[in-house]
Amino acid sequence: MAQVGRPNILNATDEDIKQLLAANCHIGSKNLEVRMDNYVWKRRSDGVHILNLGKTWEKLVLAARVIATIENPADVCVVSTRTYGHRAVLKFAAHTGATAIAGRFTPGNFTNYITRTYREPRLIVVTDPRADAQAIKEASFVNIPVIALCDTDSILNHVDIAIPTNNKGRKSIGLIWYLLAREVLRVRGTLSRSAPWDVMPDLYFYRDPEEVEREEEAKKAAAAAAEEAQVEEAVAAAEFEITDSAAGSVDPNVLAAATAGQVGENTWEGAGDWNTTGAAQTSDWTAAAEAQ
């Protein structure tokens, strides 16, 4: 994907293209806005337009270089009214230092200085020109440049840089924001191009809150089951009893000798006889000494 007038180091790798294809970033819509025709590769038989990923990467690199020129990262405002972009813009802001507006865009954020949420950004990046039309409109009033993720049916009014991509899919939105954040860090010099980024694209993907709750409940249930198993093992160890047939039994030979009256010297009775015998022997030794 070598492009004229652009260093080879800025070109997309095979891994980048595979990720874009896997996330369906090339899948457009059936409607086509006339100014988006330059970014369309072809039209399928079912009417869906396919975007040119080469131009997608070209505009993504251009947008990253523009964002990197802003001295104060907080002067870059990333906006996403679309639900699938909420987590993506928050992660983008966390990694690049930008200001995120996730959710409903309050009218007057860029124009009404009396409002508590008033901001004066130098650049804004939006997820969808249709869903974020209010932010683009206010940016045009105060001459703020706009970068937008644009589908084939997106309106390009007041959009300065359009990144052609699928801006309706959960994975496609998250991946474009991920690649944009990574490219911004690389252009700034914060991240080396030779070393992979330790952040996974999945971190930028939207997750259903109910799904998160179910996963947390499953983790809690697993932890409770493991703790209960440990308690049961401890109780079983405390109540452990020897049930072997040899436990507590008497050697048959010893029992037979005892019942037959064969008392050895190691028994208590034998010890008593041994004492008596010892005393007699001692007296005999004394008599023998006197006789001598």
Swiss-Prot record:
Q: What happens when the gene is disrupted?
A: Deficiency of 40S ribosomal subunit formation, this is likely to be caused by insufficient 18S rRNA stability.
Q: Which residues carry this modification: Phosphoserine?
A: 45
Q: Name one GO molecular function term.
A: structural constituent of ribosome
- Provide GO CC annotations from the record: cytosol; cytosolic small ribosomal subunit; nucleus
Q: Where in the cell is it found?
A: Cytoplasm; Nucleus
In its UniProt record, which GO terms are filed under biological process? cytoplasmic translation; ribosomal small subunit assembly; ribosomal small subunit biogenesis; rRNA processing
Q: What else is known?
A: There are 2 genes for uS2 in S.pombe.
Protein name, as recorded = Small ribosomal subunit protein uS2A
Where does this protein come from, organism-wise? Schizosaccharomyces pombe (strain 972 / ATCC 24843)
